[in-house]
């Protein structure tokens, strides 16, 4: 993590938290607090005037992917018991109103999911209804490419679907088990995982 841009800070934080959790599961203590706390402080101070993040410092050039990555890292830190003083007050997402002006992107799913985890006010149901057909359209394009070229391995957008299904299940109390079932696989030890 040579450059200490926001992406590298968040990635380092995730790595340190995962290492700490792993060592604790083995019953060993590890001293990473001195490394974790300054990263949390730095990331929270790098929040820009839009209450999100860019690649460097607190630049106004907001990156939604970057913001989602940082929000996930800070949520992991908070869940691990670290104080995270994050200013999301007044951040309200009006995705249905802004989408016509900027189009739809896959990173929208990641930022909506991250904001949902932080309980930011938004009409998540409408956003999911807009994004699910978008993902299906991308899948159809991939299938079309696969039909034309037998060596082409199409993307299934499983990650994006799982994020949308999680929001849908929590916000609309919709059972998404039937949607997930085709992706469930078992390993040699009967452990369950998702794969496309």
Describe the predicted segments one by one:
Residues 1-196:
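Large, well-folded core regions of big proteins
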């Amino acid at each position: 993590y040579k450059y200490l841009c926001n992406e590298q800070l968040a990635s380092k934080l995730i790595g340190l938290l995962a290492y700490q959790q792993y060592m604790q599961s083995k019953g060993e203590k590890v001293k990473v607090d001195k490394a974790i706390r300054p990263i949390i402080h730095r990331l929270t101070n790098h929040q820009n005037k839009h209450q999100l993040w860019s690649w460097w410092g607190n630049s106004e050039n907001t990156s939604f992917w970057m913001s989602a990555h940082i929000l996930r890292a800070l949520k992991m830190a908070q869940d691990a018991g670290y104080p995270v003083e994050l200013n999301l007050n007044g951040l309200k997402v009006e995705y249905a109103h802004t989408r016509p002006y900027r189009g739809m992107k896959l990173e929208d799913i990641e930022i909506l999911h991250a904001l949902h985890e932080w309980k930011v006010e938004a009409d998540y149901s409408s956003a999911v209804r807009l994004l699910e057909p978008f993902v299906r359209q991308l899948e159809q394009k991939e299938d079309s490419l696969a039909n034309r070229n037998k060596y082409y391995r199409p993307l299934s957008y499983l990650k994006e679907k799982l994020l949308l299904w999680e929001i849908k299940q929590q916000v609309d109390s919709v059972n998404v088990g039937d949607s997930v079932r085709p992706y469930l696989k078992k390993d040699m030890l009967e452990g369950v995982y998702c794969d496309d």
